[in-house]
Amino acid sequence: MSPHDRIVACFAPSGTLRAAINLGNPILAGSDPSTGAARGVSVDLARELGRRLGVAVELVTVDNAAKSVDAVVHGRADIGFFAVDPLRGADIAFTAPYVLIEGCYLVHEGSPLRSNDEVDRPGRVVVVGRGSAYDLHLSRELKHASIVRAPTSPAVVDTFVAQRADVAAGVRQQLEADAARIGALRLLGERFMVIRQAMGLAKTRGSEGAESLERFVDDMKTSGFVAAALSRHGIRGALVAPRREDAT
């Protein structure tokens, strides 16, 4: 078996590259309003990887990050697009990140909260998207505030408003869009985390596939593919991640 055939067998043992696409992260993917088809940066990357491998691509769409992780870990998808997190890293081999986005807090206009330092206090309620990178992060970091989990990231702000919670946590762009849609809401000034978006596959697929995916992501960054995809899909505020120093 040639090196190329070994890589194809690693990524697409069925002959089709199945890519888990999380429609709950609008920075990476969404549904075309006219056709309903998935589109976005992650879709473009999946199709480009399939083109290079010479195989068809099947998009396995899900509505939150936890389902995307589950699909890859349990073999219902071959690759996925995830925020890097040590808990997920137990089962998934991540590449270096290709995009960096900000995790921020949103509050009601009349809230007394003015800074991130005021969030983690007894009695505060913070709404997050179940299984998201910021859910995992805040579950470790918040020691006093309570966490309420909305079913998906796009549902966070509506849940926050309906429950009259103190804080909504999420991706800056999603929070800004929801604040404009609903009104009388504002973001706290600073981010509470940088979310590193990477590609990944199950560790059970072996090191050769992980190394090949790492090279693919590095090429997508350095060639300008990721930057062009962000621009093409009108994504603002997300940054192309720097190249890893040890990338070759």
For every predicted segment, state its role.
Residues 1-9, 133-150, 187, 218-248:
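Ligand-binding clefts/hinges and TM-proximal coupling segments of bilobed small-molecule sensing domains
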Residues 66, 82-91, 137-138, 158-193:
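A ligand-binding cleft/hinge motif common to bilobed small-molecule-binding domains
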Residues 98, 107-126:
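Flexible hinge/capping segments at coil-to-helix
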Residues 16-23, 39, 117-134, 146-147:
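Short loop->beta-strand "edge-of-pocket" segments that line small-molecule binding or catalytic clefts
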Residues 23, 100-110, 172, 176-218, ...:
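Periplasmic-binding protein-like
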Residues 49, 72-73, 119, 159-162, ...:
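Hydrophobic residues within well-ordered alpha-helices
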Residues 29-34, 46-56, 95, 120-122, ...:
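Ligand-binding cleft/hinge of the Venus flytrap
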Residues 1-83, 88, 149, 220-223, ...:
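Extracytoplasmic small-molecule ligand-binding "clamshell" domains
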